[in-house]
Design a protein with these regions (language model features):
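Alpha-helical transmembrane segments of integral membrane proteins
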Residues: 1-28, 299-306, 335-362, 366, ...
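Short, strongly hydrophobic transmembrane alpha-helices
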Residues: 24-52, 56-58, 328-330, 372-376, ...
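A short glycine-centered flexible hinge/capping loop motif at secondary-structure junctions
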Residues: 38-40, 352-356, 375, 379, ...
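Structured, solvent-exposed hinge/loop segments at the ends of secondary-structure elements
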Residues: 42-193, 198-205, 246-250, 263-293, ...
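Hydrophobic alpha-helical transmembrane segments that constitute the membrane-spanning cores
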Residues: 46, 370-391, 478, 751
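"Rare, low-scoring activations can occur
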Residues: 207-218, 233-308, 526-540, 618, ...
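N-terminal membrane-entry
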Residues: 306-323, 410-415, 731-748
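Interfacial "coupling" helices/loops that link adjacent transmembrane helices in transporter permeases
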Residues: 328-372, 755-777
């Protein structure tokens, strides 16, 4: 067929389909809405997946960015490690891995690697106390190298980015704001350039605002500001000894390959330089048998970050909404098939007038594709609403911005167009196939009623199959939702080992406003005393971090009865009266006393990372039941000593002595069994206070803030919430999945019921004469 004729007949088909759909406006509206809901649900989930998993970083030529990762059979002799890069890291157990490296190794790569046009590094995020811009507030900062922005090719929206000269210990303190932070906290004022603010008490000049599109190298993570790595000792003293320490890994390294340089060549060069770095110092950082190696991996899409949290639930939701689309196609296909049966005489007339089967197939598929197009357009609007609703749910589970987006880009538009086309073909095949098999003589000879009656019997087999498919898919969706809801209920019913009711949590960190460790301890004790005097307060204590917050850590000990064997344990520094406040049970020994905190302070190094004082007493600790069962074989641990797992070259520690045994308490997760846990006195650090009340804890929030303000006016209160809310955030992923699955299951049920109702209505309509005769008889 000539192109002109094909275009002409296609236009005719579209016009006829449009007139037909307008004549059957009610049925068309229901069909389009059904399809729009299904397509909208799929597009909403896909748009979020697109922003998190599929998009390249908003940097210049992201395909040339590479990130370094290390792996080994045994953990190297790194005596200090931090997983600040948001990468997937495993420091303990067999086959450890990570993406953090030492500052000296970064400098060596930056200055001597010929395969890269530029090499940058970063660490963070750090909580920074921002003063000098109204009321003091907490911001999330990232430590970056001076060439960070130039390596990524990220320009400044205002002012200038950081430069290599800024990353120098003797350089003035400077910072670059993120675009969102500039708008929110500085009202988008251009006068911010050159403004001096305090960061943890360090006067810092704002020199620029980052591009609007850039937030970090980790999709889903948002940082408020960026400061040079060289400022880290001034902002946080604990970073100081790490600057020139080859055994301290804390920086993530990214490099931009030179044009024309292959990854294999760059890998070989990095291997050589990494091998040289391992031999630096008095003792090698690994043995040949440890197989410590470095690997270059593409950083085109960024680091793992939020992907670890959201990939699985998004994949589950994508499968669920895919089932919704199948139900909708079966639903509409059944209705379209029923309409095709009632149009048998029309199809017969078309054939009699010379219309070929191909022409009829085109006409019927055009009608279906027109419906699918309308459904896809409406689905885009529904997807925007759905994506906003999901993002709002996710945002409510976090104390800081998630950075997730559901923006529509070309990939999302192509996805919507694709599933609309596939849907139109899926639900259009059955009626098109039926229309092509019209019996010309019988359809023209009989009246429409008889034709429909016979067509009904031919329709039953395929129509029933579509109905069964809808019901089956609906049942699968309902069962899946039921299992997810049941999982959430089971997790919520888990006993955490302490009373989670009526506990108010908030965090303070006096080091952010210049307090030294001794002064920090005094302020923490003063706050504990003043908070305990508030009305309706029945207990107050503190810990380095809240239980079940998902952010607690651990360490490795060496026990006298297991020499040379590392014994892993959770580790939580706490204050006096901690177990009484939580209503946990002390099973043996005693609780911490003020003298224990004095002993712990005496064994603390006077210089961060340095050796402990000579002849320091052992630090008193309390262990849980799981620790006793696993490492003491049920024997009494009271009075027993143990120490950190010793790595040659590290300073000796004075060790620990067990003074008590406490009942098992869930630590980081409600899913996992209680692991060995060690509690020590909290010394010289920011802490999370736990305030138990006899009434609603939220009613005490204002009084707590006022007490903190009166005690130290410059001390910000961070992340105030109840213990129940903290656990709720821990279960956020399970809760969101259960809620969305429940909604999708109800939607599947509604679509299936609507489809069955339509099919039954058509069935009854075609049997009106038969029913009338039966009633007359």
């Amino acid at each position: 067929m000539p192109i002109g004729a094909f275009v002409g007949t296609t236009v005719q088909d579209i016009r006829f389909a449009s007139r037909l759909l307008r004549r059957q406006f009610g049925a068309t509206l229901i069909t389009v809405l059904t399809l729009a809901i299904a397509i909208g649900a799929n597009t909403a989930i896909f748009s979020i997946m697109d922003g998190l998993l599929l998009r390249d970083l908003p940097v210049e030529d992201p395909s040339h960015l590479m990130m370094l990762k290390w792996s080994a059979h045994k953990r190297p002799n790194y005596h200090s490690s931090s997983s600040y890069g948001d990468c997937v890291a495993q420091f303990g157990g067999s086959n450890p891995s990570g993406c953090n490296f030492s500052h000296p190794f970064y400098e060596d790569l930056r200055d001597h690697a010929s395969s890269f046009s530029s090499v940058a590094a970063f660490a963070g995020g750090e909580q920074l106390n921002v003063s000098g811009n109204g009321q003091a507030s907490i911001a999330r900062g990232q430590l970056v190298s001076g060439n960070y922005f130039s390596t990524l090719g990220v320009a400044a929206a205002l002012g200038r980015p950081l430069q290599p000269d800024d990353d120098n210990p003797s350089a003035p303190a400077v910072a670059v704001l993120s675009y969102a932070y500039w708008l929110h906290d500085f009202s988008g004022s251009p006068a911010v350039i050159g403004k001096t603010v305090g960061l943890n008490g360090v006067p810092t000049v704002i020199v620029g605002v980052a591009a609007r599109s850039y937030t970090s190298l980790t999709p889903g993570n948002i940082y408020d500001l960026f400061v040079p790595i060289s400022m880290s000792p001034r902002l946080t003293p604990r970073w100081d000894p790490r600057q020139d320490d080859a055994g301290s890994i804390w920086l993530v390294i990214v490099g931009r390959l030179k044009p024309g340089v292959l990854t294999d060549r760059a890998q070989a060069e990095v291997d050589t330089m990494f091998g040289r770095a391992l031999s630096v110092g008095a003792k090698p950082l690994s043995k040949p048998g440890d197989a410590l190696a470095v690997t270059l991996t593409p950083a085109q899409s960024g680091l793992a970050g939020a992907r670890r949290q959201f990939t699985q639930p998004l994949t589950i939701m994508m499968l669920a909404v895919g089932v919704i689309l199948l139900i909708a196609c079966a639903n509409i296909g059944g209705l379209q098939l029923a309409r095709a049966i009632s149009r048998e005489k029309e199809m017969a007339l078309r054939i009699a007038l010379g219309g070929g089967q191909g022409r009829i197939l085109r006409q019927l598929l055009t009608e279906s594709l027109l419906v699918a197009t309308l459904g896809g357009i409406a689905g885009l609007a529904f997807s925007w609403i759905g994506a906003r609703a999901i993002l709002t749910m996710v945002a409510g589970t976090s104390t800081r911005p998630t950075g997730l987006t559901g923006d529509v880009d070309v990939r999302v538009l192509l996805f919507t167009a694709g599933i609309s086309l596939v849907s139109g073909i899926l639900f259009g095949l059955a009626p098109a196939s039926r229309g092509m098999r019209t019996d010309l003589n019988r359809s023209l000879r009989d009246g429409s009623g008889n034709a429909a009656s016979r067509g009904r019997w031919r329709f039953i087999s395929l129509g029933q199959s579509l109905a069964v498919a809808q019901i089956a898919l609906c049942v699968v969706t309902l069962m899946g939702a039921g299992l997810l809801v049941r999982t959430l209920q089971n997790l919520r019913s888990v006993d955490p080992g302490f009373d989670t009711n009526n506990v108010l949590l908030f965090r303070v960190n006096p080091t952010l406003i210049g307090y030294k460790p001794v002064a920090v301890d005094a302020l923490n004790r003063q706050l504990q005393s003043r908070l305990g005097a508030l009305p309706n307060v029945t207990g107050v204590s503190f810990a380095s971090t809240a239980l079940l917050s998902g952010s607690l850590g651990g360490t490795t000990f060496e026990l006298p009865n297991r020499p040379g064997v590392g014994c892993d344990s959770n580790w939580l520094p706490v204050g006096t009266g901690y177990f009484d406040t939580l209503r946990a049970h002390l099973l043996a020994g005693r609780d911490f006393t003020p003298a224990d905190f004095v002993a712990a302070a005496a064994s603390t190094p006077t210089v961060p990372g340095g050796p402990p004082p000579a002849n320091a007493p052992p630090t008193p600790v309390i262990v849980n039941q799981a620790f006793v069962k696993q490492y003491f074989a049920g024997l009494s641990p009271l009075g027993r000593n143990f120490n950190y797992k010793h790595t040659p070259g590290e300073p000796d520690h004075s060790g620990f002595v067990v003074i008590g045994v406490v009942s098992d308490i869930k630590y980081n997760s409600l899913r996992e069994a209680v692991a060995p846990t060690t509690y020590s006195p909290a010394i010289g650090r920011g802490v999370t206070f736990a305030v138990r009340t006899a009434a609603s804890p939220t009613a005490l929030a204002a009084a707590v803030r006022e007490t903190v303000r009166q005690t130290e006016p410059n001390l910000p209160v961070i992340d105030m919430s109840t213990q129940a809310e903290t656990i709720d955030r821990l279960l956020a992923q399970e809760r969101i999945i259960a809620q969305l699955a429940g909604f999708i299951a109800l939607l599947a049920l509604l679509l299936a019921c609507t489809g069955l109702f339509g099919l039954l209505s058509h069935e009854v309509g075609t049997r009106t004469r038969e029913i009338g005769i039966r009633m007359a008889l």
